[in-house]
From Swiss-Prot:
Name of the gene this protein is made from: Akap1
Organism in which the protein naturally occurs: Mus musculus
SMART domains, A to Z: KH, TUDOR
Listed name of the protein: A-kinase anchor protein 1, mitochondrial
UniProt-annotated location(s): Mitochondrion outer membrane; Mitochondrion
Top-level lineage group: Eukaryota
């Protein structure tokens, strides 16, 4: 039990703190509700409250403020009162508001439902109410100023001009409903920061006009309602035009874009049809809103401090977590370029506040009017939970309008990284609505997706949809280009060979690995399915244990190639190969030599183990094999061909050769002379595939357009040549005659030599050379021409053709000639009689018998 309590103790303290926090929050909430009910009862008096409720119902965001955040009556009088005018301005007001919504390029569309009404509508409505009456009364105690984002300088200038012109008309006049706009426009001129020269001129002109407006304050003599404490006071009703002005003002202001007021924490905009019934709503709703706002103003400083601390703590944790996550998935170079790139949903309000906004906000804090404005606007911002800052994407990039060009475009994206999150919560919220921060926000968004370069280069982002599309589509492009940039180029001295191995790698792999890879494909063709030779075996090579190595710049072709072949009995072949070829792979990796098993179907009891490599690696491979197979004979049986070969030939594995010491059935397909023949093994499994190959080659090379051999023609190249009866056979070039543009070819399947023009030969497809060459060139053993002749006589040739034509024969290899051709003994079976053809030619007097004739040569 003690162990369980000890494990639960670390969780007890945070839980207690959480419970205390919730208790404190709900207790404060109950106190506010009880106090608000009392205040609502005291406010339900007189017809004057009804008129005030009509104006306040249209703008429930901000009502009256506490006395601690209001100005003295004298100062408020200067800010809120304008010179009188002679007639109501309902129609000009409608035109001005509509033009404001059209000309502002930084504002979202009217249909934007993510923003909602805020202090702007309340301030305008209260100013209108305060200026209506017959005689001037005391200036209200709580005449709050418009928030920073409530108006634009050029609109205020136009208002003041119209009010000044109308106010000079003699006679009875009515105060303008836009008295506070001139002073507020001057106040917001620093925080707007649109960067346009026209706006700057309007701000300076506005300052002069505002002074004229203030100079006419003392002339106004109209009753004004004091929403802060004048509960018993009445409001004198003006002419019927005032009611129209109020209704139109409420309707038009309700349609204004909500980015005037609160860009983030706000309620959805209500429909236009619902605005009129709301003005005529019950007094209970209005009183509750009034009481709620009065109580919220008292708790603004405490709530600001608590939420600001919690907001900064959560944002810092999320930012650190996302940076750590991206550091593991993105390369170091990208991480250094974008150190603050993070895609958390809750941290955008911090990372996307530009430095220019912070400076403007810092200047505004010194102004007491702006402090009161922030205190007035904060209750509506704090009344709702924070929402995702997606609304920032709707305002930065808007299309051009009739009055002005779009102020923000993808062309203005800054490549500077986003500033760190060091601003308080209120500054972040106010900065998010600053039209000046749109460019910097787009830059921050591009940094978060690591697509700054792509977005700035495209320059086509004219709306939020295309901006968000580029944010997603440019990520892969930047990632791939970053990967390419991080790949270092090869040094000048590092030149790859044709086999893909660099010179510097040869020092690790060893000298023999270079030529081993070069000669991989030379001896792999024609091997059986049990052969362990593979073309891509160089991929499995590792660094050998041998201490020998060559220099990085050495030429691997200069290394001497050693070929060692040993006979392996049939019962040891499986052990030598190993399960799934593991032991042969072990031998390759350990010794560094190339090793494969040649499986010949004619030698059923013996197979050949082929070893290629340098002397050191061959010795190491033989040593490993000898340790495991002590009864195995490691004598080299490989007989390299003489350098003076008269007839170049393909590698042995590409030819279907006759087995040594084994009698096999053959048929003679071509006869050069009586002692020189070409035979086929018609009992071999691959023999039947030759017929199908002939048909495919005939269909292929009967079509025009097959390319010819490149010139000069290379000796030993395999090609397709015309055969008998219009057929196309496989052939090998054995000699070239450049003076006559002719070559001598040897048919590799049907035997025989022929001299043809080069242009009649065709290039052969790779799939046509996979079948082993069926024609085996042989010589008769112990048979030579007569002493008087250098060649066999025509009679000998005819007799040989008669004995071998159209019949199956038995052949056995006895030895090899000096040119490498096998010497055979040939028997014909006639009934039960077996006739040795070699002896038969001698007995007929067409040849002479000579023992070891080719050996003596």
């Amino acid at each position: 039990m003690a162990i369980q309590l000890r494990s639960l103790f670390p969780l007890a303290l945070p839980g207690m703190l959480a419970l205390l926090g919730w208790w404190w929050f709900f207790s404060r909430k109950k106190d506010r509700l009880s106090s608000s009910d009392k205040q609502v009862e005291t406010l339900k008096v007189g017809p004057a409250i009804k008129d005030r409720r009509l104006s306040e119902e249209a703008c429930p965001g901000v009502l009256s403020v506490a006395p601690t955040v209001t100005q003295p009556p004298g100062r408020e009088e200067q800010r809120c009162v304008d010179k009188p005018s002679t007639e109501p301005l309902a129609l000009p007001r409608t035109r001005q508001v509509r033009r404001r919504s059209e000309s502002s390029g930084n504002l979202p569309s009217v249909a934007d439902t993510r923003s909602q009404p805020g202090p702007c509508r309340d301030e305008i409505a209260k100013v209108e109410l305060s200026l209506m009456g017959d005689k001037a009364k005391s200036i209200p105690l709580g005449c709050p100023l418009l928030p920073k984002d409530a108006s634009f300088p050029y609109e205020a200038v136009e208002r003041c001009k119209q009010e000044s012109a109308l106010g000079k008309t003699p006679g009875r006049g009515w105060p303008s409903p836009y008295a506070a706009s001139g002073e507020k426009a001057r106040e917001t001129g620093g925080t707007e920061g649109t960067g346009d020269a026209v706006l700057g001129e309007n701000v300076s002109e506005e300052g002069l006009l505002s002074q004229e407006c203030v100079s006419e304050v003392e002339k106004s003599e109209f009753p004004i309602l004091a929403p802060g404490g004048g509960e018993g006071e009445e409001v004198s009703h003006g002419p019927p035009q005032v009611a129209e002005l109020l209704k139109k003002e409420e309707y038009i202001v309700g349609k204004l874009p909500s980015s005037f007021v609160e860009p983030v924490h706000s309620e959805p905009v209500k429909d236009e049809d619902a605005l009129e019934p709301q003005v005529k709503g019950s007094s209970n709703t209005s009183d509750r809103d009034l009481a709620g706002e009065l109580d919220k103003d008292e708790t603004v400083p405490e709530n600001d401090q608590i939420k600001q601390a919690a907001f900064q703590l959560i944002s810092q944790v999320i930012l650190e977590a996302t940076e750590e996550f991206r550091a593991t998935t993105v390369g170091k170079t990208v991480a250094q370029v974008h150190p603050t790139s993070a895609t958390q949903p809750k941290g955008k309000e911090e990372s996307c506040v530009p430095a220019s906004q912070e400076t403007s906000l810092g200047q505004d804090t010194s102004d007491p009017a702006s402090t009161r404005t922030g205190a007035t606007a904060s209750p509506s911002a704090e009344a709702l939970p924070p929402k995702t800052y997606v609304s920032c994407l709707s305002s930065p990039l808007s299309g051009p309008t009739k009055d002005q060009k779009p102020k923000n475009s993808a062309h203005h994206i800054s490549l500077a990284p986003c500033p760190p999150p060091v601003t308080p919560q209120r500054q972040s919220l106010e900065g998010a609505s600053n039209p000046r921060g749109d460019d910097n926000f787009v830059a921050c968004m591009a940094n978060n997706s690591q697509s700054v370069l792509s977005v700035s280069s495209l320059g086509q982002c004219s709306d939020p949809v295309s901006t968000s599309g580029l944010e997603d589509s440019c990520t892969e492009t930047i990632s791939s280009s970053g990967d390419k940039a991080m790949t270092p180029p090869l040094p000048v001295s590092t030149q790859p060979f044709s086999n893909g191995v660099l010179k510097e790698e040869l020092s690790d792999l060893g000298t023999e690995d270079g030529w081993t890879m070069d000669t991989e494909a030379d001896h792999s063709g024609g091997s059986d399915g049990n052969s362990m030779d593979s073309v891509d075996s160089c991929c499995g090579l590792t660094k050998p244990d041998s201490p020998q190595s060559v220099q990085a710049g050495s030429n691997p072709k200069k290394v001497d190639l050693i070929i060692w072949e040993i006979e392996v009995p049939k019962h040891l072949v499986g052990r030598l190969i190993g399960k799934q070829g593991r032991y042969v792979s072990f031998l390759k990796q350990t010794s560094g030599a190339k090793i494969y098993i040649s499986t010949l179907p004619y030698t059923q009891n013996i197979q050949i183990c082929h070893i290629e490599g340098s002397q050191h690696h061959v010795d190491k491979a033989l040593n490993l094999i000898g340790k495991k197979f002590k009864e195995l004979n490691l004598t080299n049986i490989y007989a390299p061909p003489l350098p003076s070969l008269a007839l170049p030939s393909l590698p042995m594995t590409s030819w279907l050769m006759l087995p040594d010491g084994i009698t096999v059935e053959v048929i003679v397909v071509n006869q050069v002379n009586a002692g020189h023949l070409f035979v086929q093994q018609h009992t071999h499994p691959t023999f039947h595939a030759l017929r199908s190959l002939d048909q495919q080659m005939y269909l292929c090379y009967s079509q025009p357009g097959i390319p010819t051999l490149p010139t000069p023609v290379e000796i030993t190249v395999i090609c397709a040549a015309p055969g008998a009866d219009g057929a196309w056979w496989r052939a090998q070039v054995v000699a070239s005659y450049e003076e006559t543009n002719e070559v001598e070819i040897r048919y590799v399947d049907y035997g025989g030599y022929k001299r043809v023009k080069v242009d009649v030969l065709r290039q052969i497809r790779s799939d046509f050379v996979t079948l082993p060459f069926q024609g085996a060139e042989v010589l008769l053993d112990s048979v030579v021409p007569l002493s008087d002749d250098d060649h066999f006589s025509p009679e000998a040739d005819a007799a040989m053709s008669e004995m071998t034509g159209n019949t199956a024969l038995l052949a056995q290899v006895t030895s090899y000639s000096a040119t490498g051709l096998p010497l055979i003994q040939l028997w014909s079976v006639v009934g039960d009689e077996v006739v040795l053809i070699n002896r038969s030619l001698v007995e007929r007097g067409l040849a002479q018998w000579v023992d070891s004739y080719y050996a003596s040569l």
